[in-house]
Amino acid sequence: MSCSHLSTAWSSSALASSASTTRRRSPPRSGLLVRCSLRELRTRIDSVRNTQKITEAMKLVAAAKVRRAQEAVVSSRPFSEALVEVLYNMNQEIQTEDIDLPLTRTRPVKKVALVVLTGERGLCGSFNNNVLKKAETRIDELKQLGLQYTVVSVGKKGNAYFQRRPYIPLERDLEVSSVPTVKDSQAICDLVYSLFVSEEVDKVELLYSKFVSLVRSDPIIQTLLPMSPKGEICDVNGVCVDATEDELFRLTTKEGKLTVEREKVKIETQPFSPVVQFEQDPVQILDALLPLYLNSQILRALQESLASELAARMSAMSSATDNAIELRKNLSIAYNRQRQAKITGEILEIVAGADALAG
């Protein structure tokens, strides 16, 4: 194998390794590169330098986009808070246990729809792989429970994954824009709404990657339908959490490095004024607000998934940049040794020729 092929193969594997895991591979032994010509070594050094510039630029772009993704989550929070407040107060006005709303109607579970949110691009570490592994695990659990299931895939990576596995029933594969919008969440909301209301499925679960920190994201499963009329978010085990209690994540800089500050806040809901009167039946208002709340929860999951993907890409590109720096260092050492050996050999030849002429 020539020097060019050898170092090309290693640099490609190093970049692929950084894209699939943050664990760094060991660089090639310099002894393997000593046999290469100086021209090949210079070519490889230039190639690795260019790769380093690309990965470093992708790291900086991902870091900037993470900030914007977090700002999007924070900016959309007031609307969600106000919507939850209305749901709380509406629930106090009426007896929700005695009414029948389509999105809160519970029935024996025979079929489950699993909505899987993945990324639109690669080079983001194990982000997509972790979500898809979680999906496979959940599918196995549903099989063991004897339940039917169908998958709604959102994201190019998930779409390609499930399309290569025809044994997994795929209800629909959707793609979203690079920055999640209400239009994207509305398409998902309309699909799961029709599946649940038409009783094609009895339960809808949402699988996405929750943003924890810049180096960690946890794939979680949340029950979308049936919904809780009290504005609660429930997991697959039926454990519900107050939606007004949330963790804010602030992306800041500390000692020249990006870090995340976490702060748990509790939002106090204020009751409506006694003079407030509803022109329509409260049940009709609640029936109209629940789909809107469902849409806001899907949009929130899309935004969190995007933030997790960008953080994973930033970490992967940082590791790839470190690998490129280390490979460039080893190639430079091999180049200098080869150049020194060549110069020493030429000097010895000159000295030997001079001695021969003198003798």
Swiss-Prot record:
Transit peptide endpoints, chain numbering: 1-35
Active site (record annotation): 124
Swiss-Prot/TrEMBL keywords: ATP synthesis, CF(1), Chloroplast, Disulfide bond, Hydrogen ion transport, Ion transport, Membrane, Plastid, Thylakoid, Transit peptide, Transport
Topological category with respect to the lipid bilayer: Peripheral membrane protein
Disulfide partners: 234-240
Compartments (UniProt record): Plastid, Chloroplast thylakoid membrane
InterPro entries: ATP_synth_F1_ATPase_gsu (IPR035968), ATP_synth_F1_gsu (IPR000131), ATP_synth_F1_gsu_CS (IPR023632)
Superkingdom as given in the UniProt entry: Eukaryota
GO biological process, one term: proton motive force-driven ATP synthesis
Entry GO terms, CC: chloroplast thylakoid membrane; proton-transporting ATP synthase complex
Main location (coarse class): plastid
Pfam families: ATP-synt (PF00231)
GO MF annotations in UniProt: proton-transporting ATP synthase activity, rotational mechanism
Function: Produces ATP from ADP in the presence of a proton gradient across the membrane. The gamma chain is believed to be important in regulating ATPase activity and the flow of protons through the CF(0) complex.
Oligomer status and interactors: F-type ATPases have 2 components, CF(1) - the catalytic core - and CF(0) - the membrane proton channel. CF(1) has five subunits: alpha(3), beta(3), gamma(1), delta(1), epsilon(1). CF(0) has four main subunits: a, b, b' and c.
Family note: Belongs to the ATPase gamma chain family.
Identification of the protein by name: ATP synthase subunit gamma, chloroplastic
